[in-house]
C-alpha cells in the first residue's frame, strides 16, 4: 500500500501534517507488542474503518504531506493517503486486509 504517488509520506520534522501517535490520526497499535509491522497496519485499517470521527475528517489529509516517525518503513500513513486521495475506499482496504 504505497501511497507516495498521491501524498508524500515523510518523517516528522518536515513540513506537513503529522499523523503520528501524538495526533488523532496516529496508529495506536505498536510493532512488536501488537504484531509485526504488516499486522499493525492491517489492524489500523480496521480501527480507522470503525472510527467515524476520523473517517468524517479524512479529506483534511487530501493532497497533504503526511508525517510519521515510521518512514521510510511501511506506515499507517500510507493507508491514510490512499483513502484521503480516493485511490481506495476504507471498505476496499478492510476487504483486502481480511482476505
Language-model segments: which ranges?
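Catalytic phosphate/metal-binding cores of nucleic-acid and nucleotide-processing enzymes, i.e., regions
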Residues: 1-99
